[in-house]
From Swiss-Prot:
SUPFAM superfamilies xrefs: Thiamin phosphate synthase
Protein name: Thiamine-phosphate synthase
UniProt feature coiled coil, ranges: none
Binding site for 2-[(2R,5Z)-2-carboxy-4-methylthiazol-5(2H)-ylidene]ethyl phosphate: T132, S133, S134, G163, I183, S184
Gene this chain is encoded by: thiE
Organism in which the protein naturally occurs: Methanoregula boonei (strain DSM 21154 / JCM 14090 / 6A8)
Binding site for 4-amino-2-methyl-5-(diphosphooxymethyl)pyrimidine: Q35, L36, R37, D38, K39, N67, S106, K135
MF terms in GO: magnesium ion binding; thiamine-phosphate diphosphorylase activity
A GO cellular-component term linked to this record: cytoplasm
NCBIfam families for the chain: thiE
Length: 216
């Protein structure tokens, strides 16, 4: 599974575009995964949005994840759910949704990453790497050093999120991230397709350079 660019929807900064429109544009720009995130939306409305995005991502072969709500993820046929530290317990979610359904977990340090994997997480999201205004509850950044510690602690894919832009993405890849998750760097841009395409190209280039340096 290739998971370079992971785009999280956010209607508040999407320039009036719906979650489905954001997802469609991000997929057109080469996003490997779309996460539906809307803290204010009720479950029924979120399911309707989720089904729209599921149709889009099914056509493009893009992974579809729902933030927080396992019930919504299962109801709309998503590929997985992403859980925070204060959400449903990972082991409970895993009992309710066996693999191949995916479970991702936000972690702020190596200890949380190890606990998440032991409980059944398929990937962990090191969050936030840098300070960010896109998520009010993100907390202080763990930095590249924190990312390296998380990468060294677990064998599952590590997604990096928080304050990542086209200008610092190479540094984050060099720090050990398998995937880059963004909100404002894609969703908050005037041209989502172009922003996603540019960022994915930069991720690909950074990974190639990192492999060459590592193997030299």
């Amino acid at each position: 599974m290739r998971l370079d660019l992971y785009v999280i929807t956010d209607g508040a900064i999407g320039g009036g575009r719906s979650h489905a429109e954001i997802a469609r544009f991000a997929c057109a720009g080469g996003a490997d995964a779309i996460q539906l995130r809307d803290k204010a939306c009720g479950p029924d409305a979120l399911c309707r949005i989720g089904r729209e995005i599921r149709a889009i991502t099914r056509d493009t072969g893009t992974l579809f994840i729902v933030n927080d709500r396992l019930d919504v993820a299962l109801a709309c046929g998503a590929d997985g759910v992403h859980l925070g530290q204060g959400d449903l317990r990972v082991d409970t979610a895993r009992r309710l949704a066996p693999r191949p359904f995916m479970i991702g977990v936000s972690v702020g340090n190596a200890e949380e990453a190890i606990s998440a994997v032991v409980a059944g997480a398929d990937y962990v999201a090191a969050s936030p790497i840098f300070a960010t205004s896109s998520k009010d509850d993100a907390g202080p950044g763990c930095g590249i050093s924190g990312l390296r510690e998380i990468r060294a602690a677990v064998a599952v894919p590590v997604v990096a999120i928080g304050g990542i832009t086209r200008d610092n993405v190479a540094e984050v890849i060099a720090g050990g991230a398998d995937s880059i998750a963004v909100i404002s760097a894609v969703v908050g841009q005037p041209d989502i397709v172009a922003a996603a395409r540019d960022l994915r190209e930069r991720i690909t280039t950074a990974k190639e350079q990192y492999r060459e340096k590592r193997d030299a």
